[in-house]
């Protein structure tokens, strides 16, 4: 197995310009593909997840011109020209879920599959919602999970669609992005959310991006979403992908743990991503933090001890960045509790179990519940811990922060960061100092 040894480091400072957001990149690619007109996308993330989306769109007949972090997409006016396709989508939930919905109403014969872990990530609630529209979708192996076979169905969007909201917000995102492709006699398409909707900021991203492409979504609280009929996706001409706020969290934490000043450019007060809320969590933990419209800067912590304050936090709104809080909790002056993180269990790995296991390797006492973690930091971090990453990019990036505790740490399978941030470790070590 490949591994990477980091540290020991004690300082971190400098400036980093973030790569484009994964969540925004894949949404914008699909919206541009479905729109009328040509869209130029700038600061597009180059990663495993965006590459599988790009490859899939090309197989579906979409014309793309790529040049570095810029991609020009010629829209299909709401219907893919390829009526058959076999699409391998890796472990990219941001590709599998929205493409499943778009293809379910496209009138073709498609197969969607991915890596083994993708076939363990649930999609049943989305399929149930699409079947309410008349979509024909079959499970090839296990009920409720990919791989999927999609065939032409009799699509009718007049009746409201009901979808669960407590497993993944991507199910609702996928339905919302698909509804403008449909005609209705009632004049509206409606989605009702059953139960508590998790990761609400990701739905806000979807709605705001749909607006950029000319689609108005009416939101009634968090339980009903209405798309008026007669709308079509229209290219905005040019759209820039803002920096990835989840990726920002590692560098913001490094600025707190390593003294800074460390400035992150590409996200800030004007960001549409919920994970920018990680900055608020870091302030509650005692970090000295300033924020502009598209930058955030951290200069260590405000306590003479140099330690962070422990917090008790509901992480529903920042599920990905909450992983960074879990590792930052190793540097706190007391036990930190992270709540409402059940969605971690159906991500790239079971992140609750994985996080608890790896935190214990560096000396923490960890209590793992169904939807929470309690992390009690050690007196001293265990040096030379070998961190398993579970083919999960965020596990690898989070645990790089351990090296800022003045101890070396080994990251197994470091190339898994290719999912969202291929050169993460080069960028991290350029800012960290002994």
UniProtKB/Swiss-Prot annotation:
Phosphoenolpyruvate binds at residues 22, 93, 121, 170, 351, 394, 419. One of its GO terms (molecular function) is 3-phosphoshikimate 1-carboxyvinyltransferase activity. It catalyses: 3-phosphoshikimate + phosphoenolpyruvate = 5-O-(1-carboxyvinyl)-3-phosphoshikimate + phosphate. It is an enzyme of class 2 (transferase). 3-phosphoshikimate binds at residues 22-23, 27, 168-170, 199, 320, 347. The active site is at residue 320. The keyword Oxidoreductase does not apply. It comes from the Bacteria. Its EC number is 2.5.1.19. InterPro entries: Enolpyruvate_Tfrase_dom, Enolpyruvate_Tfrase_sf, EPSP_synthase, EPSP_synthase_CS, RNA3'P_cycl/enolpyr_Trfase_a/b. PANTHER family: AROM/DEHYDROQUINATE SYNTHASE (PTHR21090), PENTAFUNCTIONAL AROM POLYPEPTIDE (PTHR21090:SF5). This is 3-phosphoshikimate 1-carboxyvinyltransferase. It comes from Paraburkholderia phytofirmans (strain DSM 17436 / LMG 22146 / PsJN). The gene is aroA.
């Amino acid at each position: 197995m490949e591994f990477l040894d980091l540290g020991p480091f004690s300082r971190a400072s400098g400036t980093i310009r973030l790569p484009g957001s994964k969540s925004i990149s894949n949404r914008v690619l699909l919206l541009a593909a479905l729109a009328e007109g040509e869209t130029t996308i700038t600061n597009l993330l180059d990663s495993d997840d965006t590459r599988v989306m790009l490859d899939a769109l090309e197989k579906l007949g979409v014309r793309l011109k790529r040049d570095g972090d810029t991609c020009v997409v010629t829209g299909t006016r709401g219907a893919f020209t390829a009526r058959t396709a076999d699409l391998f989508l890796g472990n990219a939930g941001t590709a599998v879920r929205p493409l499943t919905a778009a293809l379910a109403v496209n009138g073709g014969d498609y197969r969607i599959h991915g890596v083994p872990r993708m076939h363990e990530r649930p999609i049943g609630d989305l399929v149930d919602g699409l079947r309410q529209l008349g979509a024909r979708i079959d499970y090839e192996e296990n009920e409720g999970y990919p791989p999927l076979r999609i065939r032409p169905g009799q699509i009718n969007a007049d009746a409201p669609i009901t979808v669960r909201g407590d497993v993944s917000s991507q199910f609702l995102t996928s339905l919302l992005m698909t509804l403008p492709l449909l005609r209705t006699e009632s004049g509206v398409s409606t989605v009702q959310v059953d139960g508590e909707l998790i990761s609400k900021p990701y739905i806000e991203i979807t709605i705001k991006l749909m607006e950029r492409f000319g689609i108005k979504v009416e939101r009634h609280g968090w339980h009903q979403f209405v798309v008026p009929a007669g709308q079509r996706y229209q290219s905005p001409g040019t759209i820039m992908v803002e920096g990835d706020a989840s990726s920002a969290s590692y560098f913001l934490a490094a600025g707190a743990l390593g003294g800074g000043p460390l400035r992150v450019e590409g996200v800030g007060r004007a960001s549409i991503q919920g994970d920018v809320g990680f900055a608020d969590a870091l302030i509650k933990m005692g970090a000295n933090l300033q924020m502009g419209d598209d930058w955030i800067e951290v200069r260590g912590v405000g306590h003479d001890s140099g330690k962070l304050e422990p917090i008790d936090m509901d992480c529903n709104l920042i599920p990905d960045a909450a992983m960074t809080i879990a590792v930052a909790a190793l540097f706190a002056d007391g036990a930190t509790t992270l709540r409402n993180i059940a969605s971690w269990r159906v991500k790239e790995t079971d992140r609750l179990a994985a996080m608890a296991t790896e935190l214990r390797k560096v000396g923490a006492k960890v209590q793992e519940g169904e939807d929470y973690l309690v992390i009690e930091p050690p007196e001293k971090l265990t040096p030379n811990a070998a961190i398993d990453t579970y083919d999960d990019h965020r596990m690898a990036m989070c645990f790089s922060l351990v090296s800022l505790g003045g101890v070396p740490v080994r990251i197994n399978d470091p190339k898994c960061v290719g999912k969202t941030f291929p050169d993460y470790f080069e960028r991290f070590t350029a800012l960290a100092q002994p």
